[in-house]
Amino acid sequence: MENQDLNRRSFLQTIGATGLLVALPDAAFGARPERGSIAHETAQSAPDVEAKPQYSINFAVCGMSHDHIYGMIGAIQRGGGTLVAAYGQEPEKLSAFTKRYPDVRMVTSEEAILNDKSIQLVLSSTIPNQRAPLGVRVMEHGKDYLSDKPGITSLEQLTAVRKTIAETHRIYGIMYSERLEVKAAVKAGELIQAGAIGRVIQTINIAPHQIVQGHGDAGGGTGRPEWFWNPDLYGGILCDIGSHQVDQFLYYTGSTEAEVVASQIANVNHPDHPRFQDFGDMMLRGDRGLGYVRLDWFTPDGLGTWGDGRLFVLGTEGYIEVRKYTDVAVKKSGNNLFIVDQKEARYIDCNNLTLPFGPQFVADIVNRTHVAQDQAQCLLAAELVIKAQKNAQTVYLKT
């Protein structure tokens, strides 16, 4: 075999020197001839999806510590919601909020929101460890709740949330925006449910983030507050940004039961904040699929956006890759979906799709349904990341 390789290499070098190399077929280099076609397409929403909202509700904001609140408001407004009141505590957040929504009534206490019987839904992006206790109070006052992620940061909070849901029959939503508010992620779900890649075997989520951003509502446009560095307050890296990814694992695999196989966390490069976690990963096992998640806070400035979020879904008949926020060194736009099946490879531009979450969530509030977000799945995602965080091995890398 070694002599054959040497003879082949010598032959290629000889004909390369004589200019004959370009005439050889790809098969001479071990490449297979093309077998599958390649297609590019632009996904469009069905006409009924783009119709005006079917329902209307009044909603309020109670806590705006993270700028995710703006995306949450936008989703509910697209669904037919009217923002009627808001409450916040941080002066700089209040100033930015009132500039964006000058006509919204600002109140001076949480109670003013909770006791207003005209309000059906409360949104909050308050400090993470305060979100679940607020949600319990909201539900006890007969209102539905939509929290920024992480919506729950301890098992004790989770028990209280489940108990209150059972007693009040209210909705406790968590905005897992990396699936619910990403058009390509929505399209991936549609393809998977249609059987485009067969039965899902595994999901892999790569979720880099950026601490300091130049602009936008992802959280770092104006620097990070003190609570951002304290895992007691933000929940830890697996509980916080990992919640997006575990939601996707459950949704795409269809798992209703799952466990954390292994998890680890580290502070690799932030010695000034010794309790902060800038890296974490976890492995999951569900009753209908497997999952792996990697998280970090190391997005470099050269990327041009806050993170190169990737989703990979392996199926028995094909696979899907979603490049959510950019296509590195190719184009800046996100919502890029790639699918390979038994017939062809396709690229799908998903930017023209309409996001369904807002209208669906508002309809759920009116109709007492769970179309936008399955309640059990929502809370299972929270439970898994809390357990992953609680049981994670802390890793110390040598410098």
What is the role of each PLM region?
Residues 19-22, 29-101:
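N-terminal Rossmann-like dinucleotide-binding module
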Residues 105-115:
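Short acidic low-complexity segments
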Residues 13-53, 121-123, 360-399:
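C-terminal helix-rich "cap/oligomerization" subdomain common to oxidoreductases
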Residues 1-7, 31-33:
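N-terminal secretory signal peptides
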Residues 55, 67, 171, 180-273:
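Predominantly a Rossmann-like dinucleotide-binding segment in NAD(P)-dependent oxidoreductases
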Residues 121, 127, 132-180, 195:
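Beta-strand-loop-alpha-helix segment that lines the small-molecule cofactor/substrate pocket
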Residues 40-49, 247-327, 357-368:
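Contiguous beta-strand/loop segments that form the cofactor/metal-binding neighborhood of enzyme cores
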Residues 67, 89-92, 348-359:
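Active-site loop of classical SDR/Rossmann-like NAD(P)-dependent oxidoreductases
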